[in-house]
From Swiss-Prot:
Zn(2+) binds at residues 109, 112, 180. It comes from the Bacteria. This is GTP cyclohydrolase 1. One of its GO terms (biological process) is tetrahydrobiopterin biosynthetic process. The gene is folE. GO terms for molecular function: GTP binding; GTP cyclohydrolase I activity; zinc ion binding. NCBIfam families: folE, PRK09347.1-1, PRK09347.1-2, PRK09347.1-3. The lineage of its organism: Bacteria, Pseudomonadati, Pseudomonadota, Gammaproteobacteria, Enterobacterales.
Amino acid sequence: MSSLSKEAALVHEALLARGLETPLRGEPLARDTRKAQIEAHMTEVMRLLNLDLSDDSLVETPSRIAKMYVDEIFSGLDYANFPKITIIENKMDVDEMVTVRDITLTSTCEHHFVTIDGKATVAYIPKERVIGLSKINRIVRFFAQRPQVQERLTQQILVALQTLLGTKNVAVSIDAVHYCVKARGVRDATSATTTTSLGGLFKTSQNTRQEFLRAVRHHV
């Protein structure tokens, strides 16, 4: 991964060190190669499902799926797509909680390859560095654009921000609907799953933790 940005490499190494990286096989194939091979395999899957790929509604489906997988919903598997990060010196000496609520995310369950649809709340208490607010949203999106389990996703966002900000004082909460529960199996259309990962003062200080949890509930 020698061509990656410094920030992407640091985050990847931090996740590997903590055993939190998504299981990956090594260097990814070239983008066009991935698309071509996924298209070929998806063509075979659709034929096995007895679908007529000569139909004008289906003929482009394998190609569309290949492009969607590589360029969109699984683009976070490739650290070349890690967002450009703006880290700013904390010249104003901000030492209070910074919270971004209701970050929309769409991910994919790695067990059944169906949708996870949810929102994230992310907070941190700055030390020497602050981050452009939109970059938090982009980091959430990057890690969501992978086959995921929600628990790992929550921790990946936490560790990425801790690494980039140089502080343990980060908290992440995700509330999401899993379509592997909603659309198959038990088919529960109303349940949601909440996961929380806390670091630094968010873990050790009851007051700080409660302030964050109130923000998650919008009771601020």
